[in-house]
């Protein structure tokens, strides 16, 4: 009990007191502008030519906010011309989006800084070096092979956006800032009603990615607060007594009251054990919870999460969003890989004096493969091939130059190999390379109105080199006369790269 109170107080100490006038200071917007430029987002979103995060533009918008005529014209304009109404509405929505993005940058800065604790004598490492998607799979290889059960969790979305605002009250105690956040959310259409479809969620993500990501991460970190505490204590809670742990605000009072009414009750029904074989991994909206123990214990964890979302976050989630399976007899789709931990036979030679024995044993090893059918399906949607995987030309790219077409196809191929380098079976990757390479050849042949064979003979080895992966480039430098086909199967081992900070675009629908 004392451990939870100390842990909770430590969590409360992270609450930020945002002074409302600071949102209107010029240096804050200059800092937000620089923060947006130097962030880990793609270059096409934050660039020096992007005027969305201009501090001068935001400052002018703040000044216009005080002008009542601006808001009157933006909201109430029944007698205006339709074209003028459209322009005013467009600019009003555009200004609101700029302000909400700037607000999200200012608010999320303290949360991002506290996630990077570092001693003063050491230089703070770059953010890109701290997070790699492939590092998750290295963790799975090291930890999951020793576990028995796996829960595949689809984290539900909150029913109403007001729940997200209320969750921020634990960390932000500045009421005007919360009202400003409500203003941004209510400025979108239909946000006063319940969100009942993923289409509305996607609309908010599309119009204001940074603000939605900040709210969603705040919600996820709040629910993981409970899970992290129980993970650190490795507590085993009976289902009948788990209701006393669900409401965080009155947690301590309920525990004290329950202890007075039922002295000695927790000694019999709640017991703690230190079990290091319990691991939790999350990426975006999917999470994996693996543990060792009995099926009954893992089912209790499942219902604990369901009750947590229901009583703590005021929305009910369906039990089918949490799939509990034996790790050795199931596979899970996570971050574009179809992974499993099968038991494989392994022969061990044992030497005893003059006699030797072969011992047949079973070992567990993480197996990661690429879902070929799904990837070919998304390649067909992008018009690189048919639904059956037959390569076709890309007519929309025929207006580009030859080297631009080669560069685009080669970059897509190298990115696929780079992201899926951890696949246990490379045959699927080479099939995808064949589709992209032949699609590129058909596109070039269509542009020049010739046959594929003629065009490939004219380009020669330069055409193949555009589709070389990083591993194949190393082999081509070592053996200059080696062709692509000769070392295709030379490197079937899995390789995890630690410079991948975002998921591949073709894998996003799979996630």
Swiss-Prot record:
Record-level GO cellular component terms: chloroplast
Keywords for the protein's UniProt record, in alphabetical order: Chloroplast, mRNA processing, Plastid, RNA-binding, tRNA processing
GO BP terms: mRNA processing; RNA splicing; tRNA processing
Superkingdom: Eukaryota
Keyword Nuclease on entry: no
Molecular function per GO: RNA binding
Cellular location(s): Plastid, Chloroplast
Pfam family, any one: MatK_N
Sections of the chain in a coiled coil: none
Family classification: Belongs to the intron maturase 2 family. MatK subfamily.
Matches recorded under HAMAP family: MatK
Protein's job: Usually encoded in the trnK tRNA gene intron. Probably assists in splicing its own and other chloroplast group II introns.
Name assigned to this protein: Maturase K
Organism of this sequence: Lolium perenne
